A protein has these predicted regions:
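Short beta-strand/loop segment at the start of cytosolic alpha/beta domains
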Residues: 1-13
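Residues at the C-termini of beta-strands that transition into short coil/loop
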Residues: 8, 16, 103
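Generic C-terminal helix-cap and adjacent flexible tail
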Residues: 105-111
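Thr-Gly-centered strand-to-loop micro-motif
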Residues: 14-15, 22
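Short acidic-hydrophobic, aromatic-tinged amphipathic segments that line or gate anion-handling sites
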Residues: 98-102
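Amphipathic alpha-helical interaction surfaces in cytosolic regulatory modules
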Residues: 20-97
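Short beta-strands and strand-loop turn motifs
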Residues: 13-14, 46
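Acidic phosphotransfer microenvironment of two-component signaling modules
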Residues: 82, 104-105
Length: 111
């Protein structure tokens, strides 16, 4: 469900599910929060292939953002699908999260 790989000292989190909802949001939150156990972690959440996120999924990401800030980490998002982009904009979460349309630009933003 959740995959974490490291690239140039940046943890990249991806998902093997197309929907992030109440059924799995706690597991996702806990998995991503473990990455922030180390202070100053840099994390990208790769949303490629995620077609839908419900309110509990967005709540999960807001919780992870708080954890990141508390551990002096950085959290960014990459590759949102069009429907997810629409939801992020509708909920004005694009003003809270750093979101990049592709992985390369997201990785470069850390330099």
């Amino acid at each position: 469900m959740i995959n974490i790989e490291k690239k140039d000292k940046i943890d990249i989190v991806s998902f093997s599910v197309a929907k992030i909802n109440a059924m799995i949001s706690d597991e996702i939150r806990d998995g991503i929060n473990k990455v922030f156990d180390n202070s100053n972690s840099k994390v990208i959440i790769d949303l490629k292939g995620v077609e839908y996120i419900d309110s509990s999924g967005f709540g999960c990401f807001l919780s992870v953002m708080k954890t990141a800030r508390n551990s002096y980490g950085i959290l960014k998002f990459a590759n949102p699908e069009p429907r997810v982009t629409d939801l992020l904009e509708l909920l004005h979460l694009n003003t809270i999260f750093q979101i990049y349309s592709d992985m390369d630009s997201c990785l470069k933003s850390f330099n």
